[in-house]
Design a protein with these regions (language model features):
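Short, ordered loop/turn segments at secondary-structure junctions
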Residues: 38-40, 129, 240, 322, ...
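Generic start-of-chain signal for non-secretory N-termini
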Residues: 1-20, 27
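Long, highly charged, low-complexity intrinsically disordered interaction regions
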Residues: 4, 56, 62-80, 90, ...
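Single-stranded RNA-binding regions, centering on S1/OB-family and related RNA-binding modules
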Residues: 548-549, 553-717
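Duplex nucleic acid-engaging cores and interfaces of nucleic-acid transaction enzymes
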Residues: 50-53, 60, 64-319, 323-424, ...
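A glycine-rich phosphate-binding loop feature that marks nucleotide/adenosyl-phosphate handling sites
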Residues: 182-189, 320-324, 378-380, 404-411, ...
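Structured, non-catalytic alpha/beta "coupling" segments that mediate domain-domain communication
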Residues: 74, 88, 99-102, 227-242, ...
């Protein structure tokens, strides 16, 4: 029987030694970001994504082994555990197989078969299964089992009871069910019908559809599930019943006997009454799990891209949270996100105070030197954008605007966290501030919102919420630790995603900072309540201190590697203070062969390469490689769009069937997966990510339905 280590190694294409090392590191309490960044020699350089996949498989396989142990114990206590059954259970690689093998030994509620057994009909059922009786009349052999006044008072009723026992035994046989499961997966189709064929719904494209289980796209599965849940669709998994019964007959009927007809009837009943409904439920569950797993993957990828967007540093921002009746909330922020001023203006109906709004905004531009206006994309966004664009057109001041996604802003502004951060501000002003800060530092602001609320996925509310939360939390942790965190300015929300730091410890760090002043040395973290040695090991390298006592504290070099880093600087002839002046761009050239130097210093080559890269450009932010934010000075109208028009836009969402792109009109346009590239694209994420700036061509405009079709492939002349 393969070990957990060898199973994972084979599945993920790793060596058993690598897997064993990672498991040991995880069991010692090391986090995935820490292992990925600071234990490359031990793991062979496995990245954080692969490490999380390994961790997930480890958790599943350990749960599987625990379930096997429970099942073996339960069957053994019944005195029914054979060597063959033990071997089959121990060899099982999925939970479903374990449950199939355990099914005959589970306690059952009263069934037709159990009632027949209680009536003493099992010996007759065994005769049917044995197929050894070649002469005689089945009814004559059944007659002695008949009991007057019972449910089995005739030979026919007795034979029915025997068939019920056989049918249940076949349905409980793991090997028969496995064979039929394979047939179902290969041949079954999912059929969809309307509950009311005359009703027009968003699901009418699925009315009367039929598609093989193995080929139906994941997004379609989720759409059909939602339609069924809303009472608009009827869904059925259909398998060729004749083929399934024939397969089961072939497996069960081995020789001629007087019970052949009874056995055939039991086989057909077993499949149609017991096995088929169970397999239909199972296949629907498998389809849903497959679709949800893929949707969670897409959601996680989109969330990672959104969190990794380039910050707009040095911008003084006027943030607008549009609305109609209650007006448009305005927050003015300095380049560090500090609130300078706030008010409410009414550029939209019913007041439509365009002149007053423009005077207020122009005053903020003059008074505070604001150079960017941020507009939320919610209700009233379009009208507000027109007012802002008109203001920009009539001013000589360098000023531009951009649209930001409001998703989750209301969740944050009404949260306990927001009320603790800004107790004197109302909910709406907090929301406007959040929009402005999303531009200045998307990561620092978006971590304050539950990642499920960010809204960059498909059917997120229909997904397994525990699995979604686990995946998204992992993504946020990966991005936060990849970027690094300023220990002296980070919020508790941001600190809580740092490797090794829990939410309570994050609050303790902030409290310590408020009581004792700014951190000047990473070692001060050891004085924070409940931040122990293991937590310090896991978090220290990801927390940066600008202007501290040791210049290395402002880098991603881990304190355990300070001796090696200091020696590298010495051999390069560089003082540590050079790190505060932008680093040492030519340090790699000064050092020569890094491999030889690593051996000389007694550190691993991967670790030394990371140290050298960090000394070249200390505190480098990987988000600087992301596309720049697209700013506008004028508004584009839906009616301006024409087929063939070339535009620049920003990817707002990526789903299984394509990507939605903001091209500066109220409605995002859709680039279908077939229009993403002039080659086959298996999934849109191969080509685009959320936040990407892309060139698109308009291929269609449906003004009645408000839909825009785009292509990233230029039409051939």
């Amino acid at each position: 029987m393969p070990s957990i280590q060898s199973t994972i190694a084979q599945e993920l294409g790793l060596t058993a030694a690598q897997v064993a090392t990672v498991i040991e590191l995880i069991d010692e309490g090391n986090t995935i970001p820490f292992i990925a960044r600071y234990r490359k020699e031990a793991t062979g350089g496995i990245d954080d994504v692969a490490l999380r996949e390994l961790d997930d498989r480890l958790a599943y396989l350990r749960t599987l082994e625990a379930r096997k142990a429970d099942v073996l114990k339960a069957i053994d206590e019944q005195g029914k555990l054979t060597d063959d059954l033990r071997s089959k259970i121990e060899a099982a690689t999925v939970m479903q197989r374990v449950e199939d093998l355990y099914k005959p030994y589970k306690k059952k509620r009263a069934t037709r078969a159990s009632k027949a057994r209680d009536a003493g009909l099992e010996p007759l059922a065994l005769l049917l299964i044995a197929q050894a009786t070649t002469h005689g009349d089945p009814r004559a052999l059944a007659a002695p089992y008949a009991k007057a006044g019972s449910a089995y008072d005739t030979p026919e009723a007795v034979l029915q009871g025997a068939r019920d026992i056989v049918a249940e035994a076949l349905a409980d046989d793991a090997e028969h069910v496995a064979a039929l499961r394979t047939l179902t997966r290969r041949q079954a189709v999912i059929e969809v019908a309307a509950v009311d064929a005359n009703e027009k719904t968003v699901y009418d494209t699925y009315y009367g559809s039929s598609e093989q289980l193995a080929r139906i796209p994941n997004h379609r599965i989720l759409a059909i599930n939602r339609g069924e849940k809303e009472g608009k669709l009827k869904v059925h998994v259909r398998t060729d019943a004749d083929a399934a019964v024939a397969l089961l007959e072939k497996r069960v009927i081995r020789r001629p006997s007087i019970f052949a007809d009874e056995l055939k009837a039991a086989v057909a009943d077993s499949y149609k009454r017991l096995i088929a409904p169970s397999l239909e439920r199972e296949q629907r569950a498998e389809l849903t799990e497959r679709a949800q797993t893929d949707a969670i993957r897409v959601f996680a990828k989109n969330t990672e891209s959104l969190l990794s967007q380039r910050p707009v540093r040095g911008a003084r921002v006027i943030a607008l949270d549009p609305g109609y009746r209650t007006g448009c909330k305005v927050a003015v922020l300095d380049e560090y996100g500090k609130l300078l001023d706030y008010t409410t203006v009414y550029p939209t109906p019913p007041r439509s105070d365009v002149a007053g709004t423009q005077r207020t905004l122009a005053g903020y531009v003059r008074t505070y030197g604001a150079n960017v206006i941020v507009i939320g994309n919610g209700t009233g966004s379009r009208e507000t954008e027109e007012v802002v664009a008109d203001l920009i057109a009539r001013t000589d001041t360098p000023l531009s605007y951009t649209i930001v996604n409001e998703a989750g802003a209301s969740v944050y502004s009404a949260s306990q966290l927001a009320s603790e951060e800004y107790p004197d501000l109302d909910v709406t002003t907090r929301g406007a501030m959040s929009l402005g800060r999303r531009l200045q530092d998307p990561l620092a602001e978006l971590v304050k919102i539950p990642p499920q609320s960010i809204g960059v996925g498909q059917y997120q509310h229909d997904l397994n919420q525990a699995a979604l939360e686990r995946a998204l939390t992992g993504v946020v942790e990966n991005v936060v630790n990849r970027v690094g965190v300023d220990l002296n300015t980070a919020s508790a929300s941001l600190l809580g995603y740092v490797s090794g730091i829990s939410a309570p410890v994050a609050k303790n760090i902030v409290a310590y900072r408020e009581e004792h002043g700014a951190f000047t040395d990473r070692r001060q973290l050891k004085k924070v309540p409940k931040l122990g040695a293991k937590a310090y090991l896991n978090c220290a390298g990801f927390l940066r201190i600008a202007g501290g006592k040791n210049p290395l504290d402002a880098t991603s070099v881990h304190p355990e590697s300070y001796p090696a880093a200091s020696e590298v600087l010495r051999r390069a002839g560089v003082e540590p203070e050079a790190l505060t002046r932008g680093g040492v761009p030519d340090i790699a050239k000064r050092l020569g062969d890094v491999g030889a130097l690593a051996a000389d210093l007694g550190v691993g080559a991967p670790t030394l390469r990371d140290i050298v890269a960090e000394l070249e450009k200390p505190g480098r932010d990987p988000r600087d490689d992301a596309p720049e934010v697209v700013f506008s000075r004028s508004v584009r109208d839906f009616d301006d769009l024409e087929a063939g028009m070339e535009l620049t836009g920003t990817v707002r969402n990526v789903v299984d069937f394509g990507a939605f792109v903001d091209i500066g009109v109220k409605q995002d346009g859709l680039v279908h997966i077939s229009k993403l590239a002039d080659r086959f694209v298996k999934h849109p994420s191969e080509v685009v990510s959320v936040g990407d700036t892309v060139t698109v061509w308009v291929t269609g405009v449906d003004k009645d339905r408000g839909k825009i079709s785009l292509s990233m492939v230029k039409a051939k002349a």
